[in-house]
């Protein structure tokens, strides 16, 4: 949100060192070969084609030669202006005539100059030349016939340069807080080791989803709305005035310093004849924005392919807007809402031609750009000057780099993250926006009246181009006042010069110095994001060989490439924890500053319910609760996008990779969980459970190493909620799912060692529990049967590694060739006849049970039986000396409390408090949740401190 800062000076103030007036009355002369043609266009005149025009303006002891060419590319072919209210009429004919008005170009063949003017009703617009900005417009008392004659037609040319002498301190004109959000941190992270941007492209029709790290043209289809106050103030010139503002904003977005090819395209202009037909506009800027966003959403077309569909909407009003703390507000918009039909909109308080800069600034917020003075921008790019578009105190635009490096980096990440995919379709009928500088259409006097009201005049002795000082009254006295905006581009500032972006510059030929950009060589690959387990290295190239200039095309194609590195497994991978789990655990003890969570909170990854766009954010759930948060804007490069996928995250985007960890590899896991395998190293185990008893019923024990697990419970006769529910326990007998007669109705992710099981929830006709990757711990599947005891139908299948000496000829099989498991007991219906020479009896030991304690010294037990060859028990037949152990010691050291140093006292005198970090550390130094340590022995974490008396 832009805020307005008005400085007031006495009328007699004169800039120190200024010896020449800051405006002159001039007569533009057309100097191109077709000197017999029309010199200015009027509505209804014939089109002169795409020929170039040259105008000479002599002022300020120099000649300005404006080399102009038609430029209406910011108007969609289907552009139309429509009145809503009384009278109701379409003005398409007038809109078509306006396409011929707008020209753009350069001054005196100067590469850094700039001109954007309208030739309708005289020369009106702005241009910049050698550090000064010029605004030109016909004198108000000049008749239309005079303005059409070859060498007649008085115009007012105003020059604005750097401000000299006393001036008011500019205040922020934008109410958007100069803070940061996770998206900004993510956007700037790649730039921390360097302070350069990335490249982009030129125009070409595209559609669909954008590729990551690729420069692609974007087309911002725009609705422009003017309320009743604008209609009354501007009258018949309103449409031309609005398009002049949008033409200036569009040219700013085509500047290469934004590092992206952004094309502002107006698809429709709505002029509201009375207040009842439009949104409710009040002095409350935030409320007006909300009203306008809701109103424009109802008018927009459903399909992006419709010629009049818009991606963003802009409301212009003369209403004095007020922000939260001041009524100096000039504009307001939500941050990062481009392509959101409900919120991609902005509100602009019209204060004359400088509103073009307000429009570009607020649209920058819609593109997720913060102010340049936010801390994260300064940390990466250093302290930025206050003359870029996203400065909160916009005064004078840097003509060479209107967009800061921070703004370019953030909009690049915003578009690369898929937030600008609605901008990929090129309008079928764009409205042509004026390319003439606004100073050629609006005189200094007109600029003052637009900014400060009827009767306001330019103050004498203004410094050229920098700030527009206009007369006004304060406490009955005549004063000079400014809103810290420069003169409009195109205002003359001397002989052969005009104002451009706050500087007085020479005129030049636009086409002679046009330079298309080209890619430079690839920079070296950076460091690997991980030391083991599969990291990523990045390399970039810049559009700097050469850098596009003077309207030249930007580079198109891939600007960032990547490769895998350090693929060897990490030593800690044997624990079964994923890299994402480790990143979540790093936040253990952080309660997100909410009283809903304790400082003993432990964080685990959240997978279910996460949109594909957010897979590479570090979204973690507080273990044992339903609360989840984005703890980091992106995971470390090389982190798996999902636990059942081999794709990895690169700069916050999910990129395809093979199971070998290599980006671009096509290797896949087979059903056995073997990378690049042929499905021959494992066997399939299937089974069916249909006869339950009330309560929990054992279904199957799934050993460690099982992969491609698929368990389904079909509702009785297709019913949802047939009172049968899947349950899951770990090897310690702890329920991981639907235990203690409490079931989960929603989708859940169950994190186990080595894998994640996806649970469908109970709200489906087919309740499912699935995992693709091998599990590294045994699990037990049960079914909870309650209520009417309708028969369940639980089918399960999974794959187990084959034993090295397994003999397939003696393996029982079902008719389909797969071993069949009935409640974890192999079917022996097809058992092969046993030979007569049976082996002797042997000891058979079961699996070790859980440890009797969770930590410390405990015992484990197991069953040991003597079995003869038919499987019958008979302890006397076995050798007692070789009997296996039935008990053994177990237990790891208990977690301990680890203390840090006390913090300084919270007060410098009197009674305050101090605190020290406290962590629960397990065996091997692993950070645990606090509830896993002995809370009865928890050391004091917070204490009072008393210093000297105050």
UniProtKB/Swiss-Prot annotation:
Tissue expression notes:
In the adult colon, highly expressed in the muscularis externa (inner circular smooth muscle and outer longitudinal smooth muscle), muscularis mucosa, submucosal glands, crypt, villi epithelial cells, goblet cells and lamina propria. Expressed at perimuscular and peritendious areas in the developing limbs.
Regarding how it is modified after translation, the entry says: The precursor is cleaved by a furin endopeptidase. Glycosylated. Can be O-fucosylated by POFUT2 on a serine or a threonine residue found within the consensus sequence C1-X(2)-(S/T)-C2-G of the TSP type-1 repeat domains where C1 and C2 are the first and second cysteine residue of the repeat, respectively. Fucosylated repeats can then be further glycosylated by the addition of a beta-1,3-glucose residue by the glucosyltransferase, B3GALTL. Fucosylation mediates the efficient secretion of ADAMTS family members. Can be C-glycosylated with one or two mannose molecules on tryptophan residues within the consensus sequence W-X-X-W of the TPRs.
Q: Name one GO biological process term.
A: extracellular matrix disassembly
* Record-annotated TSP type-1 domain positions: 516-571, 839-895, 896-949
Q: Which of this chain's residues carry glycans?
A: 141, 591, 623, 679
The record's region (Disordered) falls at 144-172, 798-822
Record keywords: rRNA-binding included?
A: no
Region described as Spacer: 701-838
- Principal localization? secreted
Database matches in Pfam families: ADAMTS_CR_2, ADAMTS_CR_3, ADAMTS_spacer1, Pep_M12B_propep, Reprolysin, TSP1_ADAMTS, TSP_1
Its domain description in UniProt is: The spacer domain and the TSP type-1 domains are important for a tight interaction with the extracellular matrix. The conserved cysteine present in the cysteine-switch motif binds the catalytic zinc ion, thus inhibiting the enzyme. The dissociation of the cysteine from the zinc ion upon the activation-peptide release activates the enzyme.
Q: Indicate what this protein is called per its UniProt record.
A: A disintegrin and metalloproteinase with thrombospondin motifs 15
Traced from the root, the source organism's taxonomic lineage reads: Eukaryota, Metazoa, Chordata, Craniata, Vertebrata
